[in-house]
C-alpha cells in the first residue's frame, strides 16, 4: 500500500477542499490531527499541526511548510476540473499546457500543496 502525506494547516478545511474539488472520500479522521482520504487507487493522508508527523518534523525544521511533493489527478476534462478546483479555493501554479503524452496543469491547494491535473491523449 502507498499513500501521499500532505502537511496542512486545517484538516477539516482540507477534507472539504479535496472532497469538493476532486471527489475524494473520507476514509478515516482522527480529530483535528489527521485524516485519510481515498480516490480510486490513491490514498491521501492530511496531517494537521497536531499530528505526530508534523510534530516530529518540527523538531528538525521548526519552520516546516508544505513541500514540493504533488499528487496527480487523472482526468478526461482538465478544464472543468481546473475551474472546480479554483472555485473551491485552489490556485493555478502552472496553467494548462500540452506535452507529448497529454495536457497537464499544476494547481496549489489552499495550503500550497501541489496538485498536477493530467489528461492523456487518446
Each PLM stretch: what is its role?
Residues 1-2, 25-73, 81-108, 119-122:
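Vicinal oxygen chelate
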Residues 13, 19-28:
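N-terminal first-folded block
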Residues 14-19, 85, 112:
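Conserved active-site tyrosine of GNAT-family acetyltransferases
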Amino acid at each position: 500500500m502507498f499513500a501521499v502525506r500532505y502537511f496542512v494547516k486545517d484538516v477539516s478545511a482540507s477534507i472539504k477542499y479535496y472532497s469538493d474539488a476532486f471527489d475524494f472520500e473520507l476514509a478515516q479522521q482522527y480529530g483535528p490531527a489527521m485524516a485519510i482520504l481515498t480516490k480510486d487507487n490513491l490514498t491521501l493522508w492530511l496531517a494537521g499541526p497536531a499530528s505526530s508527523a508534523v510534530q516530529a518534523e518540527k523538531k528538525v525544521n521548526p519552520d516546516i511548510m508544505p513541500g514540493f511533493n504533488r499528487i496527480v489527478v487523472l482526468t478526461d476534462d482538465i478544464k472543468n476540473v481546473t475551474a472546480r478546483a479554483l472555485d473551491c479555493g485552489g490556485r493555478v501554479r502552472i496553467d494548462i499546457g500540452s506535452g507529448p503524452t497529454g495536457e497537464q496543469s499544476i494547481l496549489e491547494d489552499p495550503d500550497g500543496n501541489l496538485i498536477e491535473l493530467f489528461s492523456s491523449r487518446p
